[in-house]
Amino acid sequence: MSTGAQTKAAEASQHADGPRLLADVGGTNARFALETGPGEITQIRVYPGAEYPTLTDAIRRYLKDVKIGRVNHAAIAIANPVDGDQVRMTNHNWSFSIEATRRALGFDTLLVVNDFTALAMALPGLTDAQRVQIGAGARRQNSVIGLMGPGTGLGVSGLIPADDRWIALGSEGGHATFAPMDEREDLVLQYARRKYPHVSFERVCAGPGMEIIYRALAARDKKRIAANVVTADIVERAHAGDALALEAVECFCGILGTFAGNLAVTLGALGGIYIGGGVVPKLGELFMRSPFRARFEAKGRFEAYLANIPTYLITAEYPAFLGVSAILAEQLSNRTGGASSAVFERIRQMRDALTPAERRVADLALNHPRSIINDPIVDIARKADVSQPTVIRFCRSLGCQGLSDFKLKLATGLTGTIPMSHSQVHLGDTATDFGAKVLDNTVSAILQLREHLNFEHVEQAIDILNNARRIEFYGLGNSNIVAQDAHYKFFRFGIPTIAYGDLYMQAASAALLGKGDVIVAVSKSGRAPELLRVLDVAMQAGAKVIAITSSNTPLAKRATVALETDHIEMRESQLSMISRILHLVMIDILAVGVAIRRASPNAELAEAMARAKARAGASAGDEAADVLDWLSHGAAPAAKE
């Protein structure tokens, strides 16, 4: 299966990290495929879900059948809502944890999305040969697209254009309450209510819904129907000309048309409504001759509006694979930075020019970069099946000085491209979900700080601190923790330091400061009027103020030097979690900077440090270099005996 790319072109653009597993899991069957390169989908196989106790068992069977080795990345479109780590299928008995499944199968990535979200992402790429228009109407470019499809359930989704990409909507719109449009549908509703307290559109216009319609009409006509009659039998009888089956199909298509019209006006889907799922394609000409389109347009005052919106039947054989492939590709691109990650792009560009042995090292770096970063050269050589000198030659072929230099560049390529976004924690999130969100939010905030921090101001602050006669750290509430941490670090430099978290003590101490003294004020809001008045007193006496705060705050504007740590916090009323981490990081940066200044070979400074340490009872040999090692997250200085 190809999306239009020529075979030779596809062969030239195979996924560097190996084939990707794609899956389309419905209530009845699980379909699997391998994507060897962009748009090149092969080895499509279908497995009845009832034959496998778990989804993991079905995936393992498929991987065994196609004789594939390791798969690094996989994406699953599933006929079920996906909200968090736990998935419990509505129309099947499979229940699983996404993360536990990923670990059990040894995947680096396992993405699970709603099947109609995946199908929606396939719509912009469909060709005329992969869809059939029903009725009139012309789609408007760059407009919202609606998607629906009866299968075991009634799937619903939509696509919203956003610049040069599309955003898929996750929806459970099939569970909207069914509203009959005529007496026959009233009868169907009354029949369905005997079994279901809430009759949704899914109950009457998904696959099993045709059975309800058929039996309701049979009960009206006082006809006996065998208990084992299913939708496939009804469709077969309709194609054979059976009057009751034909009426059931007609009623089914009419209800589907009403639902499609509801979806179109709800979304404003001027880009068209697409119909997927497994039921409608089996109706063939019965659907084309049905009242579907007439009922789609039957919206009274909005009839003309709907008449201009086209409706399409998707005829592509496995369209969900196209969509889930696109979602997985975007996810991986966001994670690795795509072409923006220079080191990975360099490896790909150079690969064909390398020797066969060096290519094996290149493939290891592309497919398992963290192994390269963390492993010693002997393990890297063993995993790539090359000699250790070959590993070094590979690094130098890329313009690196050696393995250490290459590891550093590779690590930067990985860690420097984490998406800078903020994820909201929701009630009901599992530990896996909210733990990952807290960590991701913190990492993203630190990376944003690295990108936007004014390092010229950092240098100025370090110079001020290094030459200070006395340093006082002020922080109120949560910021007092940061002030205490700073005091603990800076007093080791032999500079008189203290931390105050009480406004009265801050005011009393600030009144004693003067020229040569420094206050480091830590505040998320930067607006506390009492703190600002204290700082004004100190600055009027000649003291300098370094502010660690948000930009454009009164504190930032007053300070001698402002180190701005802007970020997204969940709620103003909450305990400031991310700001505390960023403020602690800023203290680390300042402390390391001062330690570097004081570890330099300056005789006068070294003598002053020695005198300070002697007064503190420490050995003069315990130099600032030891403190630097400790501050920069090396080993803490050993205690002197």
UniProtKB/Swiss-Prot annotation:
EC number: 2.7.1.2
Localization (cell): Membrane
Catalytic activity entry: D-glucose + ATP = D-glucose 6-phosphate + ADP + H(+)
Membrane topology: Single-pass membrane protein
UniProt GO cellular component terms: cytosol; membrane
CDD domains named in the record: ASKHA_NBD_GLK (cd24008), SIS_RpiR (cd05013)
Keyword Transmembrane in annotation: yes
Residue ranges of every copy of the HTH rpiR-type domain listed in the record: 341-417
UniProt keywords, alphabetically: ATP-binding, DNA-binding, Glycolysis, Kinase, Membrane, Multifunctional enzyme, Nucleotide-binding, Transcription, Transcription regulation, Transferase, Transmembrane, Transmembrane helix
Signal peptide (UniProt feature, chain positions): none
DNA-binding region per UniProt: 377-396
Binding-site positions, ATP: 23-28
GO molecular function terms noted in the UniProt entry: ATP binding; D-glucose binding; DNA binding; DNA-binding transcription factor activity; glucokinase activity
Region (Disordered): 1-21
GO biological process, one term: glycolytic process
Keyword Metal-binding annotated: no
Family, per entry: In the N-terminal section; belongs to the bacterial glucokinase family.
HAMAP family: Glucokinase
Protein name per Swiss-Prot or TrEMBL: Bifunctional protein glk
Organism: Burkholderia thailandensis (strain ATCC 700388 / DSM 13276 / CCUG 48851 / CIP 106301 / E264)
